[in-house]
Amino acid sequence: MLRTHDAGSLRESNAGQRVTLAGWVARRRDHGGVIFIDLRDASGVAQVVFREDAVLEQAHRLRAEFCVEVSGVVEVRPEGNANDEIATGQIEVNAAELKVLNESAPLPFQLDETAGEEARLRYRYLDLRREGPGNAIRLRSKANAAARSVLSGHEFVEVETPTLTRSTPEGARDFLVPARLQPGSFYALPQSPQLFKQLLMVAGMERYYQIARCYRDEDFRADRQPEFTQLDIEMSFVDQDDVIALAEEILVALWDLVGYRVPTPIDRITYAEAMRRYGSDKPDLRFGLELVECTDYFSETSFRVFQAPYVGAVVMPGGADQPRRTLDGWQEFAKQRGHKGLAYVLVGEDGTLGGPVAKNLSDAERDGLAAHVGANPGDCIFFSAGAAKSSRALLGSVRGEVAQRLGLIDPDAWAFTWVVDAPLFEPADDATAAGDVAVGSGAWTAVHHAFTSPKPESENTFDTDPGSALAYAYDIVCNGHEIGGGSIRIHRRDIQERVFQVMGISNEDAQEKFGFLLDAFAFGAPPHGGIAFGWDRVTALLAGTSSIREVIAFPKSGGGVDPLTDAPAPITAAQRKESGIDAKPEKAEKAGKPADA
């Protein structure tokens, strides 16, 4: 090793020892013929002082981010010069030798200053030298180790599943890779290890896990990445409670890393209750502001807007004094989410109701409205009316925005919940409208994925009454983020084929795309279930950052572009020809047999 000690490890107990450090010049300061540098390595920072003529002249050459090796004696800092803000603030190293290992070009941005995201991603290797970004990646490594420790303790087997497989419809678009030896044919990068982990259960592995790379070619909404990571888990001979218990053990180990003890068992809420009370299937429970049902209250209203299948409300405390411009902004807020607007009523300090909606209500409706929704003088009541699902979703968004604007969310709080009993299917048009891919050609598509088992009480009726069928599924939510989702899987061919039929996937298509799984079910497939944690989101929460890019070593920008390598990039004509990307495959050729040149 070039060094004897890590810079961040030095303490007063090291005083008098000769040490050799290696790292980067974080800062240089000249004081009356003496030069100080903050030497930074992965462990932290130590102050180095250059007093001796032999090294002083060399030290004058040092600039920010020069890579150096320094030898000297650890000394306690003079009285009054200690720095209590850093762990090594009681000592300094009196340098006797200095070696410049490599110089640095002028920096594109100062590492101790704020920089734009584009510059940070383009020079990510510099960005990661900073304490915050570097520590986020190190915390992710600790999270990996903590999860592996829990799973190893339960005798799970870590298995790597293929990253070159066939394209199967799973709810998003595949990234495709041309197969050079079979011109016109393509591999697909996996959207998840779902099918392979189920096959591992058929294979008798019983307990599997993998920190898996996954790929989805989708429109890049806020904070999405084309490649992402899951902690993927599958177990045989289990029910929902078994998987949840293991998942909670992992969560406890993870949050122990940041000094928080997750209380277990974690509360559960049904999907229906979550939507009714919070307008979201991933509710943030760090604050109240529950939705209020108003459908029955306005059942005989003459106000046409409220003559709807569903009417609901959410109260904004103190919101009655919002200026007109702000209230108009709420209309734009609703329109951005696909709604015509957001109705509101202002409760005056004397209890009278104001605003355009109040004028259209009957005296009886006005008199009892504040009490019905729990509004006080000075509050604003927001309403949404229409189809229950979309109206509740809008109110859920309003609820979150109100909490943000009013500072109702404790940034240091943690609130976990399981959301269970979600629908097994949703209308295909709803999935498409939400930006998802509706698998199959039927009127219904799977809410989670096509391999989720119906709950036992829905097993005999899910194909005759798809809208009422419940999934044997469970999602874990933390602070309004879905950080994991799982289900008990289908392990019988007949049930799987019935699910496919509901989704408009014919037996022929099912055999072509999923025949390997269906065939495996014929060989004593055991009951099994599992869960996958969104590892980027989990580690972002642990690191205290709102963006998953902060916990990915080399993330893509919002458009799926890598500013560092400038990927994706065009290929050459020679590469295109060699890959066979334009060739048309011969249908008669057998899989695994190369096409003729």
UniProtKB/Swiss-Prot annotation:
Q: Which PROSITE patterns match?
A: AA_TRNA_LIGASE_II
State the reactions this protein catalyses: tRNA(Asx) + L-aspartate + ATP = L-aspartyl-tRNA(Asx) + AMP + diphosphate
Where does the entry annotate site (Important for tRNA non-discrimination)?
31, 80
**UniProt-annotated stretches for the region Aspartate:** 194-197
Q: What is its EC number?
A: 6.1.1.23
Instruction: Name the source's superkingdom.
Output: Bacteria
Q: Where does ATP bind?
A: 216-218, 225, 482, 534-537
Return the CDD domains for the record. Answer: AspRS_core, EcAspRS_like_N
Region of interest (Disordered), ranges: 558-597
Any Gene Ontology biological process: aspartyl-tRNA aminoacylation
Q: Where in the cell is it found?
A: Cytoplasm
- Keywords (A to Z) from UniProt: Aminoacyl-tRNA synthetase, ATP-binding, Cytoplasm, Ligase, Nucleotide-binding, Protein biosynthesis
The cross-references to NCBIfam families, in alphabetical order and at most eight, read:
aspS_bact, PRK00476.1
Q: Which family is it part of?
A: Belongs to the class-II aminoacyl-tRNA synthetase family. Type 1 subfamily.
Primary role:
Aspartyl-tRNA synthetase with relaxed tRNA specificity since it is able to aspartylate not only its cognate tRNA(Asp) but also tRNA(Asn). Reaction proceeds in two steps: L-aspartate is first activated by ATP to form Asp-AMP and then transferred to the acceptor end of tRNA(Asp/Asn).
UniProt xrefs under HAMAP family:
Asp_tRNA_synth_type1
**PANTHER family with a match to the protein in the record:** ASPARTATE--TRNA LIGASE, MITOCHONDRIAL, ASPARTYL/LYSYL-TRNA SYNTHETASE
- The protein's name: Aspartate--tRNA(Asp/Asn) ligase
From which organism does this entry originate? Mycobacteroides abscessus (strain ATCC 19977 / DSM 44196 / CCUG 20993 / CIP 104536 / JCM 13569 / NCTC 13031 / TMC 1543 / L948) (Mycobacterium abscessus)
